[in-house]
Structure formats: structure tokens, C-alpha cells
Amino acid sequence: MHIGIGLPNQVRNVDTAIVPRWAARAEEAGFSTLATIGRYAYPGLSDTVALAAAAGATTTIGLLSAVLLAPTWPGALLAKEIAGIDGVSGGRLTLGIGIGSREEEFTVPGHGLRGRGARLDADLATYRDVWGGTGPNPAVPSGTRQVPMLFGGSAAAAIDRMARWGEGYIGGSLPAAMTAPSFEAAQRAWRQAGRQGTPKLVALAYFALGDAETARANIRDFYRMAPEAIADNVVLCTTPEMINRSIADYTELGIDELIFVPATDDLDEVARLADITTVRV
């Protein structure tokens, strides 16, 4: 199982200038992937900006949105943005897609909460068309690749989209026992869709190996509008033992990659996590 690390782009009032340095240190430490968390109505750094900054500060580490709230965007515009980030990174981006559930995230006229599932279904075809240079006025340079997509969400529709359009599934930042049914559903849907091989499975867990009190406050703030079943069960690893327990739990589930998401923007957290996980990276 690979070990990745998140960017602190959605830590409340993040020092945004730290993102490129965080990305460079993560690559130097040997992590497999840099991931972002996506929200609009929150005082953080948008995932597309964070991913672009990380792309410019690194050369080899993978990049992942985990997850970007795709229905909040006009489809063609998002497809162009994603193609651009993937291009400047040298083809290192994977687009992780979520559908969103908070009314305040949906601010673009015509892109409200209602109807977001149907919009996303249509937009997925738009992404493919844009990346393929379809039409008399292509929106992306020739040679743009089809950016691989992963999907988050536990609803049946999300799992079905993953099986039709994606390369794998991203679980929520909950205990392994709570996310296991969704991972199993993703694998089952993949087989039922007649897909070859197996879906890539990615798990998330928050961590804070420095200021645990601030980290807990940040997570409570971020999830204050989430359902209690989520807000009360978000995983926050604050000790080496908890990090190792999460690794063991997800290894047992057969997960391909576990990404530890920072709950603070303390740059030293990169080294602290690497000191624990280095033998597995």
C-alpha cells in the first residue's frame, strides 16, 4: 500500500504561501501522492489553485483532488482547468470527483444543489470531449490526455458513476470499519460493469502530530455542517501508534493508497509523518 499526504489547502485561514514548500518537502520525503480537499464556501485555498501550485513545485509526485466538488463548476471550464494542471505537471494529475451536499458550496447560477447528479452525468461526457479536442475550436492543446478519474461518495449513484467512468474509488475520512462497505460496493460494481482488472482504492485519514488541540478544533470547524454520523467519526491520527493502526487497518482491507490529510498547516508535519511512514513509502 502506498502512502500519500494531503496539502493543507482547506485548513481554516491557511497560510497559502506554504503550499509550494509543503509540496516540495512531500516529494523529497518520498510520499506517493499530494492530495487536496475541495470546498468553495470555506476560508481555504481552492483545490485547483493548490494543485497547480504543487505541480509547479514538484516533478515526480502524483497529484489528486480528494475530492473536487465537480457539479459546482461549469463542465467545460472545469475540464479545461484540469487539463491545464495535468499538462503543466507532466501528466501526474488524477481527478477525484465528489458531488457535494452543502447548499452554500453551489454559488454559480444554474449550478445549484438541485439536479447536481444529472448535471454531473452530463459533465462527465463533456470532460471526455474537451480532453479529446472535440469540435472545430478545441479548448485544449493537441496531445492532451484523458485525465484519470476517481469517485467519492457512498450513494449508489456515486458507485455506479465510478464503475462507468472512473478508474477507482476514494473513501471518506472515517474509520476503516465504516468505509469498508463502500470499498466493497465499488469492487462489486466494477465487476458487474464488466470492467477489467480492479478499481484503484484510496483511503483518507486526517493527522496532526504536533498541535493536536488546534487540529481537533480545525476539524470540528470544517465539519460543523456535516451530518453527525460523519462529523463525530472523522479519523484524526495524533500519535505514531494511531498512524500505524490506520496503515494496518487499510492494509488489511486491501486498499491501494492511504493518504494522510493534514489538520494544521504546520510545515514540520511533513517530516513528522515521514519519520513514521518512511519504511512503507
Feature roles, as predicted:
Residues 1-281:
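Active-site-adjacent structural elements that line small-molecule/cofactor binding pockets in enzymes
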